[in-house]
Each structure stands twice: as C-alpha cells, then as structure tokens.
Amino acid sequence: MAVPKKKTSKAKRDQRRATWRRQAALQAQRALSLGKSVLTGRSNSFVYPEDEDEDED
C-alpha cells in the first residue's frame, strides 16, 4: 500500500489550504459580480431570445 514517506509540515499544509481558500473566494466573488450584472441588466455578454410571436400579431 502506498504511503507518504514523510509527514507534511503544518506550514506546507496551511499554505496549500490558503491557496485553495483564496481561489474559492475569488471564484465566489466573480460569480456574485456576474449575478449582480445580470440582475441589473448591465451585462453585455449574454444574448436573450426575444419573443417575436407577440410582435407579428
């Protein structure tokens, strides 16, 4: 069975966790910003289909 040769230090463990948490926080911030822009109608990167059936009548 494969096992690590040496125990990972607490500093290395904390450094990795800090990196993961920083990346998660950045993604959460981007998602929140994107959601806000969609809700306020300021986003230009989304194309919404318009109902043309109502206009033709």
Swiss-Prot record:
The keyword Ion transport does not apply. GO terms for biological process: translation. Residues 1-24 are annotated as: Disordered. It holds the Pfam family Ribosomal_L32p. Keywords: Ribonucleoprotein, Ribosomal protein. SUPFAM superfamilies: Zn-binding ribosomal proteins (SSF57829). InterPro entries: Ribosomal_bL32, Ribosomal_bL32_plant/cyanobact, Ribosomal_zn-bd. The keyword Electron transport does not apply. One of its GO terms (cellular component) is large ribosomal subunit. Residues 1-20 have a biased composition (Basic residues). GO terms for molecular function: structural constituent of ribosome. Belongs to the bacterial ribosomal protein bL32 family. NCBIfam families: rpmF_bact (TIGR01031). This is Large ribosomal subunit protein bL32.
